Amino acid sequence: MDFFNKFSQGLAESSTPKSSIYYSEEKDPDTKKDEAIEIGLKSQESYYQRQLREQLARDNMMAASRQPIQPLQPTIHITPQPVPTATPAPILLPSSTAPTPKPRQQTNTSSDMSNLFDWLSEDTDAPASSLLPALTPSNAVQDIISKFNKDQKTTTPPSTQPSQTLPTTTCTQQSDGNISCTTPTVTPPQPPIVATVCTPTPTGGTVCTTAQQNPNPGAASQQNLDDMALKDLMSSVEKDMHQLQAETNDLVTNVYDAREYTRRAIDQILQLVKGFERFQK
């Protein structure tokens, strides 16, 4: 009986295809849930696409209805500048001690200037001399230059180092009336030159030697190396380092030789002990 039931059940399962309506209706709950989610996502995507198309259409309609905006033209305001008026220079009394410069050589422009003054005097009642600004005498310029040079010398602060001096500007007036000022260049003292040479030793260490050379001749020298050139100094240091390295190599070689000699001596003693034990047996 059980065999008949199993046979009928197997026959029913084999005769029902998977593509039938009965099988398609019985779906897995997870599959139904996934299909519902997929349908919801597709509907949501289509909704947002429709909203985007409508918004783009509204923007195009609004852009077409608007008129182009004309850019604003910049406005330029021109403010007239007042013409500067020449103020006459004050007349300074000439100094009796200052040398009188040579007068300038007049060219053909003097006749043109005199004609211009005559023409101005004919048009106005004022004399031609009143139309010219007051000029500063050349002796007053010499006084200003002398006072400037004197102030430069008196206001120069004393230097803390005797070997360093501050530059002083000196102004002079040439024969043609031009004023030239000169400032001497002062070279600052150079810092001392320090050279360091390091040499590795066979044992793994490093030996360094430092030498200092002061190029300033006015500085107080506390070492005899100041009078030696830098090239000679470096060659001397290198020679000393080579000699020191050779001595170190000899010392290390002697230590190695002593260690080897001790090892051989111990081996010989052990051989003698073994031979003595064999002799006793």
Curated annotation (Swiss-Prot):
Cellular component per GO, a single term: host cell endoplasmic reticulum-Golgi intermediate compartment membrane
Low complexity bias: start-end ranges: 154-175
Compositionally skewed regions (Polar residues) per UniProt: 1-22, 94-112
Comp. bias regions, Basic and acidic residues: 24-33
Alphabetical keyword list: Host membrane, Late protein, Membrane, Virion
Start and end residues of each stretch annotated as Disordered: 1-33, 91-112, 149-192
PTMs per UniProt: Its phosphorylation state is regulated by the OPG054 kinase and the OPG106 phosphatase.
Xref: Pfam families: Orthopox_A5L
Compartments where located: Virion; Host endoplasmic reticulum-Golgi intermediate compartment membrane
Database matches in InterPro entries: Poxvirus_A4L
Induction text: Expressed in the late phase of the viral replicative cycle.
Oligomeric form and interacting partners: Interacts with OPG136 and its cleaved form.
Family according to the record: Belongs to the orthopoxvirus OPG130 family.
Function comment: Component of the virion core. Participates in virion assembly.
Protein name per its UniProtKB record: 39kDa core protein OPG130
Organism per entry: Vaccinia virus (strain Copenhagen) (VACV)
